Amino acid sequence: LSKRAPVAVVSLLVAVLAGCGDTGDGTSSGTGGGGRTLTVFAAASLTETFTSLGKTFEGAHPGVKVRFNFGGSSALARQITQGAPVDVFAAASPATMKTVVDAGDAAGAPRVFTKNRLVIAVPKDDPGKVGGVRDLSRPGLKIVLCAEQVPCGAAAKKALDAAGVRVRPVSREQDVKAVLTKVRLGEADAGLVYRTDARAAAPQVRGIEFAEAATAVNGYPIAEVAKAPQAALAKEFIGLVLGGQGRTVLTQAGFEAP
């Protein structure tokens, strides 16, 4: 009996230790024992800035993961009104946010936190020799624009109309990043994108300012989504975006004050 006792004690200790290390409840050590996920839908043009702010938010909230869905604002708004579980929505135009508000899917009034304007994006070698907005109507030039139903497309139409320039794009894309990609890859001679996107893609892409862009500056509203799964975290994230840290990150990226 005395010889078996130590073996029994060791076996018991192993069992206890194994039980302590069990993560069968679905909680891993990386989530801080009860991790939560904040889901943010945001316009594609916010990819770089919101990714940075997301890391800041996670650093201040151990155990919290910020999950982003970046894309065309109109498509994101449609997903929200169709019931997607989302905590925060940041759109690239008040008109797009209005569709969410009108559907009763915004908790409280949205707040415009920044503004953005268009530039002409050209590849770094500028094969089309584009010098300004009037060059966009030149025959043979491959121009790419956003679809008119998304904020960057609506802004492009307004700016081009103000310039009196008629453009026949070779394609219309669902978000500004898709336009930027075609320009960067040399599949287009030029495209209209937000200033911040052209700056983020430098030096592969160069942005050309034009005066008429001032007629189509887009305001970016942000709101907590109604029935947000993480309502308290949503409010805190919005506070970060609206606060000093958010303003610094946005300004450094080329966004304008609201």
Each model region followed by its residue ranges:
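A short, gly/pro- and small-residue-rich
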Residues: 103-110
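Exported/periplasmic ABC-transporter solute-binding proteins
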Residues: 4, 17-59, 65, 74, ...
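Bacterial N-terminal signal peptides that target proteins for export
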Residues: 1-9
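Short, glycine-/small- and polar/acidic-enriched structural segments
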Residues: 110-118
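Bacterial N-terminal signal peptides
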Residues: 8-18
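Periplasmic-binding protein-like
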Residues: 87-91
